[in-house]
Amino acid sequence: EEKIIDALKTMKILLKNRALLKISGNDAEEFLQNQFTNDIKKLDRKKVQFNAYCQHQGKVIAFFWVMRMGEDFLLSFPDELLEKIENRLKIFVIMSDVIIENVTNVLSQTGLINESSPNECRINDELAVVIEDSNGQSVELAENHIAWEKAYLDSHLPEIYNVTSEKLVPQMLNL
């Protein structure tokens, strides 16, 4: 266990187990504002904003990292929830000028532990994520999901997976 902690001092990890949806269109900000628990209008371009997506009884379906990319928004979450989330969000688009696009295979997500990058979105003081074109990766990245998950859990940040989806309310996640 001590060796894992030492290895976490600085690290870049390819986050292959996370899905990425792009939300765009003239009504994207208002659409997300009406769907999630946090104030999307206060989203800082260089930071990750945490948001819960709840069903009608108030139970959390998913927990997102929301980021801005130009005028668009990116939602990052465990890939096992992709189909469920994408389909559910599309139900609520109705007449809004909103496009929901799965960009998981187009853009890559790199987790940074105690490192920085000019293109980063900060999660907290220790963790950040970089979103870039999947073809543009020039650095060999570790695929050590256990190291990332340990650092993420050590930061006391929640995560929702299929097994916990629609089981908890935001207060149980300290949101």
Regions found by a protein language model. Name each.
Residues 1-175:
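Basic, glycine/lysine-rich polyanion-binding surfaces/domains
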